[in-house]
Swiss-Prot record:
The protein, known as: Transcription elongation factor GreA
Keyword Transferase applies: no
Keywords of this entry: DNA-binding, Transcription, Transcription regulation
InterPro entries referenced in this protein's UniProt entry, alphabetically: GreA/GreB_C_sf, TF_GreA/GreB_CS, Tscrpt_elong_fac_GreA, Tscrpt_elong_fac_GreA/B, Tscrpt_elong_fac_GreA/B_C, Tscrpt_elong_fac_GreA/B_fam, Tscrpt_elong_fac_GreA/B_N, Tscrpt_elong_fac_GreA/B_N_sf
HAMAP family xref list: GreA_GreB
A Gene Ontology biological process term: regulation of DNA-templated transcription elongation
Keyword Transcription regulation in annotation: yes
One Pfam family recorded for the sequence: GreA_GreB_N
Length: 158
């Protein structure tokens, strides 16, 4: 898995902060917890020790994952671009022709996607269909429930 990963600036900074917290706070704390649990004697029936070792495994795994992800990541900077088409990182307002409702999505990476926050993955059916389209374009998207048709009514690079 050596492919590069596009991230928004917000997501990149969030991953960096999580990595710093794990290395500077969580790792030393779990090492201290292991030492304290070890001081209680018999490790074969020491639930505190087992829990701390499990937590240490999780923390070390997450540190590895974040280091790998950040090493392959690049930040998509939209600040110098004219918002004339849908690209990774753009915020798009759509008009759903069937429901006659407006929907706003931000096109993000897979790790950032959260439909409740209006963030959809660039690899999702809707995300893939929207990328490259311009203002006032009509876009048909095949979704599990059938085909949806949207009109792009606004594009922002935030």
């Amino acid at each position: 898995m050596s492919h590069s990963i596009p991230l928004t600036k917000e997501s990149y900074e969030s991953l960096q902060e999580e990595l710093k917290r794990l290395i500077r706070v969580e790792r030393p704390k779990v090492i201290q917890d292991i030492a304290e649990a070890r001081s209680h004697g018999d490790l074969s029936e020491n639930a505190e020790y087992d829990a701390a070792k499990n937590r240490q495994g999780f923390i070390e795994g997450r540190i590895q994952e974040l280091n790998s992800k950040l090493a392959r990541a690049y930040v998509v900077d939209l600040s110098n671009m004219k918002p004339d088409k849908v690209v990774f990182g753009s915020t798009v307002t759509l008009y759903d022709t069937a429901s006659e409702e407006e929907i706003t999505y931000k096109i993000v990476g897979e790790d950032e996607a959260d439909i409740k926050l209006g963030k959809i993955s660039c690899t999702s059916p809707v995300g893939k269909a929207l990328i490259g389209h311009k203002l006032d374009d009509s876009v048909k998207v095949k979704v599990p429930a059938g085909t949806k048709e949207y009109e792009i009514i606004d594009i922002k690079y935030e």
